[in-house]
From Swiss-Prot:
Pfam families found in the cross-reference section: DUF444
InterPro entries the record matches: UPF0229
Entry-linked HAMAP family: UPF0229
Protein name, entry field: UPF0229 protein Ping_2705
Top-rank taxon, per record: Bacteria
PANTHER family according to UniProt: UPF0229 PROTEIN YEAH
Region (Disordered): 77-108
First and last residue of the signal peptide: none
Similarity-based family: Belongs to the UPF0229 family.
Amino acid sequence: MSYIIDRRLNAKKKSTVNRQRFLKRYRKHIKKAVTDAISRRSITDLEHGEEIHIPAEDMKESFFHHGQGGHAKRVLPGNQDFIGGDRIERPPSGGAGGSGSGASDSGKGEDEFVFQITQAEFLDFMFDELALPNMIKRQLLGSDEFKLHQAGFSNQGSPGQVDVVRSLKSAHARRIALTLSKRKKLKALEKQLHLLVAKEPVLKNQVEIEQLREKISTLKSRVKRVPWLDDFDLKYHLRAKEPAPQAKAVMFCIMDVSGSMNQATKEIAKRFFILLYLFIQRNYQRTEIVFIRHHTVAMEVDEQEFFYSRETGGTIVSSALKLMQQIIEQRYPLGDWNIYAAQASDGDNWNNDSAVCKEILCKALLPKLQYFSYIEITPNAHQLLWHSYQQVKANFPDTFAMEQVVDAAEIYTVFREIFHKQVI
């Protein structure tokens, strides 16, 4: 009797691979369910997964079968009504069809397949195919991430790392070194034996010939006893770890908290930034987040104050952009950091300030930034700030994005549009 001992690390989750394969197969249905769930839920309500419904017809697997109609010969095992040679009448046209609408006292069907995805799987599908654009600046950081590279060869290693060619060369060299003297002596004895055998029968010394043959046999056996391949011959690829260059990024979150931003508009802005915060924290380990709130004066605040402070005032958008410029110059060298910014506002701004915002973005900020995104939360006609930003987008189409949000249901769609993964 044979025994199978399961030493897998995921012993309590033996179906993990099958589950991953299942999620991959029904990816389209799951992504649609996640998108619908986000439109129903609050962005902060992400403490649980989601129930996924898959229609029964989508669960069926493809298979080959005979189509209806035509002529075919078939063998029906276990038939008690017919014998070979009997002719079976063709059913009347449409006889194989259903009865259409109406109730039935027979038949069966299948319900939808329902299963639950975890919170981690929900977030994976939620942020699937999203990325911070243009993250190209990389450097060596003090991290535990490494990449392996070829660093020569070693006499020890795992069987999978054996260099076959180098091992065979080493074995061949060892055999030559260990048998060289014996082969030379063997060659000399064989030559001497050949000379003795070639003499006239009267002059042959049979005793000497037998002695030579015995010596030759002994030497050959000694040569054969040298192993063809020894543990000493095995050479293994040596792979060494070296620190991998890591991308380092900072995201500036700029939110308008002026008096023109009513409570509903502020809630939409907060939801957008909560979604951005979750996205960065989940997908990028080495990304710092700088929170800036502004009315007439801009302030750098912590996460708690950014989302929950009730301070308000007038509107000067350029104050936030100027503060962002100062922080970059003081703390984030351009050669080391990928710099991003996301701004949310209702579009209301002091009239003369929109031109100042355009100048700061075009001359001071965007040449240093990897990406700047702006969302305007308003159901009304756009104001001067939007039109000024349109001119900025015309000059920087690859690094500047702007979208309008009317209500909370559009947040996730706009977020995916801004941060969709770019194919290079």
